[in-house]
Amino acid sequence: MESLTLQPIELISGEVNLPGSKSVSNRALLLAALASGTTRLTNLLDSDDIRHMLNALTKLGVNYRLSADKTTCEVEGLGQAFHTTQPLELFLGNAGTAMRPLAAALCLGQGDYVLTGEPRMKERPIGHLVDALRQASAQIEYLEQENFPPLRIQGTGLQAGTVTIDGSISSQFLTAFLMSAPLAQGKVTIKIVGELVSKPYIDITLHIMEQFGVQVINHDYQEFVIPAGQSYVSPGQFLVEGDASSASYFLAAAAIKGGEVKVTGIGKNSIQGDIQFADALEKMGAQIEWGDDYVIARRGELNAVDLDFNHIPDAAMTIATTALFAKGTTAIRNVYNWRVKETDRLAAMATELRKVGATVEEGEDFIVITPPTKLIHAAIDTYDDHRMAMCFSLVALSDTPVTINDPKCTSKTFPDYFDKFAQLSR
């Protein structure tokens, strides 16, 4: 297996422009495909997850033109749900942002579909979404294990009315249903059961739907009403924000070993909840400065925090490795959904933090981290999880090297991450 050893870094300083957000890119591509009119998407992320969505859209009869650098895409909207005459199999890798929204969207029109992916995708739950879609008369069957992909979907349309959806495992189930609801056969009301996790990701969904001309009435995240008679209309141009989760590594690096790092492509008005990572970093002692389209982080004396990270679970992973440089014991709480991501991130994070010398307590939905007096050089396993690889790059900000196994797994969201990280390192 390929590995990459990062030597100790003395100083982190400079400017980095973020690749487009994965969450925004795949949502916008799907809505552009369903909308009437042509949409020109700029700053699109070029990564595995986006490629899986684009490949699926091609098979579904959507025409688009992709620039040579793959960051600008002109999508010719269908102006309706997908209609296919031949049975189709769509392979979606490990892209939850493609699997969940497409599973809902393919129920709307006509066609016979199988949705499948990599082995890890078959371990990632989708039952709560399927249950909700079935309430709206969707025809879906599990081909292997109950509640998990692969799925067979017969497109027959989604009925109007009220459905309940469990929000406690992943917000992607609600996102998927919300994006399909305007093309259902009438007014749709979605009632949430349990505590809705990752609410900021729902805000992203609602914001993008609004840009494509659809209004959703949000009753305090407990009930969502999608009035009848709406359809998606291209906004013409659509700028994909920089990926706020990807910003977290550079901001944390500056907090630990700045200098200062300026991250461009997101700012104080970002629609992504993961910009709240900077607030958590500030609580630890970093200096943070906000602009309209940038964030600057500077080094500070870092202290441990004990916080609920339910709203920003992806960026919270970066706090786990930042905790290695903080005084005291850090607790990251209410992150059960780490267990159903690209890998079981609670187990993986605990295992790898212990390798570098940390004392770790792992609970069902929390992790508590006490740093060692000196970090140990270890080979970090990444579990085919892009965020594990990027989080553990921060270990090199000590006086100890770190070896990252399978560094190319960052291609899921940030193919040139290690190049960008090296450019800022002194």
Curated annotation (Swiss-Prot):
Its main location: cytoplasm. Gene3D superfamilies: Enolpyruvate transferase domain (3.65.10.10). It is found in: Cytoplasm. Pathway: Metabolic intermediate biosynthesis; chorismate biosynthesis; chorismate from D-erythrose 4-phosphate and phosphoenolpyruvate: step 6/7. The keyword Amino-acid biosynthesis applies. It comes from Vibrio cholerae serotype O1 (strain ATCC 39541 / Classical Ogawa 395 / O395). Its EC number is 2.5.1.19. This is 3-phosphoshikimate 1-carboxyvinyltransferase.
